From Swiss-Prot:
Effect of residue 213 to A: Great decrease in FBPase activity
Binding note for cofactor: Manganese. Mg(2+), Co(2+), Ni(2+), Ca(2+), Cu(2+) and Zn(2+) cannot support activity.
Additional note from the record: E.coli K12 also possesses a FBPase class 1 (Fbp), which is the primary FBPase in E.coli and probably represents the main gluconeogenic FBPase.
Substitution effect: residue 85 to A: Great decrease in FBPase activity
This protein's pathway: Carbohydrate biosynthesis; gluconeogenesis
Binding site residues for Mn(2+) 2: 85, 88, 213
Regulation: Competitively inhibited by low concentrations of phosphate (IC50 3.0 mM) and is also sensitive to Li(+) (IC50 70 mM). Slightly activated by KCl.
Record protein name field: Fructose-1,6-bisphosphatase 1 class 2
Record's keyword terms, sorted: Carbohydrate metabolism, Cytoplasm, Hydrolase, Manganese, Metal-binding
Effect of residue 88 to A: Strong decrease in FBPase activity
Consequences of knocking out this gene: Cells lacking this gene grow normally on gluconeogenic substrates (succinate or glycerol).
Amino acid sequence: MRRELAIEFSRVTESAALAGYKWLGRGDKNTADGAAVNAMRIMLNQVNIDGTIVIGEGEIDEAPMLYIGEKVGTGRGDAVDIAVDPIEGTRMTAMGQANALAVLAVGDKGCFLNAPDMYMEKLIVGPGAKGTIDLNLPLADNLRNVAAALGKPLSELTVTILAKPRHDAVIAEMQQLGVRVFAIPDGDVAASILTCMPDSEVDVLYGIGGAPEGVVSAAVIRALDGDMNGRLLARHDVKGDNEENRRIGEQELARCKAMGIEAGKVLRLGDMARSDNVIFSATGITKGDLLEGISRKGNIATTETLLIRGKSRTIRRIQSIHYLDRKDPEMQVHIL
């Protein structure tokens, strides 16, 4: 990919974040997400790429979402696959809580695992523990191996995990080992990036979250030279084996089979992101551990964006000032 595309993709996540921010704290996560989707699509279609959404917001019949298989861009330029999460943390945006982001990852054609929208077990570490993780092993063994690689005792190891009932037993297990556990309400993409940031105290991300978010995480972890294992899980294996969950879970398993993916098999980082020639952009909507949130006074807004180019392993933090009433009219509808 041409390196100048990076700044174009930062504009895409900035616009999605500004659109989502318009609905900050209003209790309507679906409207916030829809606004971010529309803004992201408008900006993507202005970029000189022949792009295909491979991780998106829904299936082909679920417009106006950015659906899997949708073509974006002008059709001229590099052929790329795109993984999007227009708002990573829709509930946090709706409730005015921390760590909401607009996220985009772009790679060469065939770069990303075309994961179904289902659950994924994830284990992520930074460069210092690369090659030490294996989801086939018990979690305790993995944590000991990571701690050894980092040259620290378990008592100094920090693990981030989503604060969900399904993780209660795992959190207790880790705390009994002496590990420090940060339980966060949502937003495991941001938490996964923190494992690879030099100034972060987070060593490990573990837990069960969304598979699409897992592929987005894999893209940025590959770009930052970290490591990740994933395992696709059917809904009834995560949420409980009742009739409804079983019905949905069987549909997920059928989709995996049709896509040639084996659920329950451990996926390595190279299975999910097959190249480090990726561009990742994330813009903060609300203030968080990774990025500042949007600040807006009248028609002037300030954003902070994390822009990573994997091929050169360049990490940029971009602070931008936006005069919203100077944006294109079709964008003003979503951000003003």
